[in-house]
């Protein structure tokens, strides 16, 4: 019989608690800890007050390619790569720290909205890139690094910030900050006033 380490079990419980707090799905918890499914479900119920959601994990790379999700996924992945290269952390710890950085930059709305990129999707994104299904690619216009399908031809990718889809303009709300307003819109208003 293999003896379980009490220290390792305590670390797994602490990690599971942090992942549950950030919104991880049960499959992610099972993959990243050595705790039994039953213990994870009990821990989830204790922390969240409800059982974990049922269903399969996202398995399609297409979700990461739509304009808004791509921007958020790319922001997370760039933070992930930076932390990974720094060498101060590894494994799921890098995913958690990068996700916390992402949440600092893209906080959920005040209405209790969920963030656009959930922790489990961020974790799945890392797995997709590691398996070669997705890759980071440089935008030929702005030079930013964005997530694309694997084997994207070199110098052919234009990000959705440089070339936003028409529906993106409809969703955008103008900021009250003068530096954030679009000068073309202001010029258009000035011409209409004359």
Swiss-Prot record:
Give compartment(s): Cytoplasm
Give the cofactor note text.
Binds 1 zinc ion per subunit.
- For the ligand (Zn(2+)), the binding residues are 139, 142, 159, 162
Do you know which Pfam families this protein is assigned to? FlhC (PF05280)
Mainly resides where? cytoplasm
Source domain of life is: Bacteria
Q: Which cofactor does it need?
A: Zn(2+)
Keywords attached to this Swiss-Prot or TrEMBL record, sorted alphabetically, are: Activator, Bacterial flagellum biogenesis, Cytoplasm, DNA-binding, Metal-binding, Transcription, Transcription regulation, Zinc
Gene Ontology biological process terms from the UniProt entry: bacterial-type flagellum organization; positive regulation of DNA-templated transcription; regulation of bacterial-type flagellum assembly
Q: A single GO CC term, please? A: cytoplasm
Query: In its keyword annotation, does this UniProt entry include Transcription?
Result: yes
A GO term, aspect molecular function: zinc ion binding
Family per UniProt? Answer: Belongs to the FlhC family.
Assembly and partners?
Heterohexamer composed of two FlhC and four FlhD subunits. Each FlhC binds a FlhD dimer, forming a heterotrimer, and a hexamer assembles by dimerization of two heterotrimers.
Q: NCBIfam families from the entry?
A: PRK12722.1
Q: What does this protein do?
A: Functions in complex with FlhD as a master transcriptional regulator that regulates transcription of several flagellar and non-flagellar operons by binding to their promoter region. Activates expression of class 2 flagellar genes, including fliA, which is a flagellum-specific sigma factor that turns on the class 3 genes. Also regulates genes whose products function in a variety of physiological pathways.
Matching HAMAP family, A to Z?
Answer: FhlC
Give the protein's recorded name.
Answer: Flagellar transcriptional regulator FlhC
Originating species: Xenorhabdus nematophila
Chain's gene name: flhC
């Amino acid at each position: 019989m293999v003896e379980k380490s009490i220290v390792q079990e305590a670390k797994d419980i602490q990690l599971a608690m942090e992942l549950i707090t950030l919104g991880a799905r049960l499959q992610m918890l099972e993959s990243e800890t050595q705790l039994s499914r039953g213990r994870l479900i009990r821990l989830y119920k204790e922390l969240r007050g409800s059982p974990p959601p049922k269903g399969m994990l996202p398995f399609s790379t297409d979700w990461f390619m739509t304009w808004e999700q791509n921007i958020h996924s790319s922001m997370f992945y760039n933070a992930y790569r930076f932390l990974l290269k720094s060498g101060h952390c590894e494994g799921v710890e890098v995913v958690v720290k990068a996700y916390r950085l992402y949440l600092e930059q893209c906080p959920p709305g005040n209405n209790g909205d969920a963030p656009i990129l959930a922790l489990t999707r961020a974790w799945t994104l890392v797995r997709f890139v590691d398996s070669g299904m997705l890759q980071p690619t440089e935008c030929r216009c702005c030079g930013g690094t964005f997530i694309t399908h694997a084997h994207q031809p070199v110098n052919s990718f234009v990000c959705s910030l440089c070339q936003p889809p028409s529906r993106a303009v409809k969703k955008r709300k103008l900021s009250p900050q003068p530096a954030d307003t679009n000068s073309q819109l202001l010029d258009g208003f000035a011409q209409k006033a004359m």
